[in-house]
Amino acid sequence: MEQSHQNLQSQFFIEHILQILPHRYPMLLVDRIIELQANKKIVAYKNITFNEDVFNGHFPNKPIFPGVLIVEGMAQTGGFLAFTSLWGFDPEIAKTKIVYFMTIDKVKFRIPVTPGDRLEYHLEVLKHKGMIWQVGGTAQVDGKVVAEAELKAMIAERD
């Protein structure tokens, strides 16, 4: 049953995120949700550290966080927004759902992300119909846009 959860808490820590998103190391790319307005917008972040496995090869002696992982982090953040907008903070329902990418559009990478950066994801709902969600927004470091994208996803039953 689809419903709206307008009275959600606005901040979620890693222990909450792990109860909603199915992603785990090394693919969980959201450390904290710092703002959430159901059916409207979300702000989250990931702390980028030199200890990320990806820096072993991207690139030795010049570590740059891959743009595709920035987009994945935006997608995970959007998935959290979509799920909690429909079902609130409900770990039991979360065990039965999964969010799948449908499209990735208007992607632009502007500034490299490097160790020590706090990568913030700022997303807003562009469209929503049933289990289909379209979100758009930016990834930012220190208030500067490092990437932008529009993402469409669907929430499905997890097998």
Swiss-Prot record:
Enzyme class, spelled out: lyase
SUPFAM superfamilies on file: Thioesterase/thiol ester dehydrase-isomerase
Signal in keyword set: no
Catalytic activity as recorded in UniProt: a (3R)-hydroxyacyl-[ACP] = a (2E)-enoyl-[ACP] + H2O
Gene3D superfamilies: Hotdog Thioesterase
Keywords (A to Z) from UniProt: Cytoplasm, Lipid A biosynthesis, Lipid biosynthesis, Lipid metabolism, Lyase
Cell location: Cytoplasm
Membership in a protein family: Belongs to the thioester dehydratase family. FabZ subfamily.
Name of the protein: 3-hydroxyacyl-[acyl-carrier-protein] dehydratase FabZ
Species, as recorded: Helicobacter pylori (strain ATCC 700392 / 26695) (Campylobacter pylori)
